[in-house]
């Protein structure tokens, strides 16, 4: 099937991306105890907090790649169709269950809810890799969005979610692109990634590949503002080559 061929192609590309990220971020090797094997063949347990359009769409792509997914909502019974579509390795639960379940936690909530996620589930996520894809919109999220955009969303999210291995990713493309452009023919759509923890960045890199996209490592969390909403690379459907050129990488 053509999707599996593209997936194999993306897997081959991962070693090149990981080498580049390790070289750029540190001269020391990246050691991924417990998760290193998952990057070759083992499925990861991923808890998704916020299973709406983007959380649900990305979760489906990860389920297709063989990962175990716990979609969550305050009304998990409403996620039955999503779980059925995702297959036998997926289930639904409450956000607390997702925070407990996941080796990786994907936070896909309206940005104004991010501080509450930290307050409610931060203790359960301590030391875990957390991928944050929320975007602050002033019209929807109010003054806190303006503050987050001024700081850069990576820096702001780190304040809301202390003690986790935070990565910013999956915020700079739409849920429509996730559904329609994953594993497409030719050059894949790029997804920018920013994070301070090398292990977390490496795992997020693999998860971008698993979802059917091309990872572009931009730098630490202080660089995540380069792909915040309103920037030149936000929801532009760029290839990795185009994105690197735009960002000067």
For the regions a protein language model found, what residue spans apply to each?
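C-terminal segment of N-terminal export signals and the immediately downstream linker at the start
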Residues: 30-65, 70, 74-79, 89, ...
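Rossmann-like NAD(P)-binding element
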Residues: 87-89, 95-129, 134-140
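Active-site phosphate/pyrophosphate- and oxyanion-stabilizing loops and adjacent acidic/basic residues
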Residues: 80, 119, 155-156
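N-terminal secretory signal peptides and thylakoid transit peptides that target proteins
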Residues: 1-25
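Rossmann-fold NAD(P)-binding glycine/threonine-rich loop
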Residues: 134-167, 172, 182
